[in-house]
């Protein structure tokens, strides 16, 4: 029996010059998503997606690599300048921003959008190791 041919969607090159780089830096991982001004994702990468496992995901080097790969694929769409929003307290915050600059993107603004509770939910109990 002959198999049906599945038509695959080709990745279309978008000509977007300014975008927003969302860096989510937790204690366990760093996720970098680069979007256009409206929030539509152009490219994304994370330390876990690059093959870092366990505690190696939370290193600044892993955040740097994730930021570099996300910026390279976004620059293929014509991205030149980027605003950076950083969320979370993780160790990969600064190194991810530096990697965006060294990849050739012009960083126009850096915003910290870490959510801070106004005494909301009770935090989890302290770890005793």
UniProtKB/Swiss-Prot annotation:
Keyword RNA-binding tagged: yes
Intrachain disulfide bonds: none
Gene3D superfamilies: Ribosomal protein S11 (3.30.420.80)
Keyword NADP: no
PROSITE patterns xref list: RIBOSOMAL_S11 (PS00054)
The organism's place on the tree of life at top rank: Bacteria
GO cellular-component term (any): ribosome
InterPro entries noted in UniProt: Ribosomal_uS11 (IPR001971), Ribosomal_uS11_bac-type (IPR019981), Ribosomal_uS11_CS (IPR018102), Ribosomal_uS11_sf (IPR036967)
Keywords: Ribonucleoprotein, Ribosomal protein, RNA-binding, rRNA-binding
Molecular functions (GO terms): rRNA binding; structural constituent of ribosome
Protein name listed in UniProt: Small ribosomal subunit protein uS11
This protein's encoding gene: rpsK
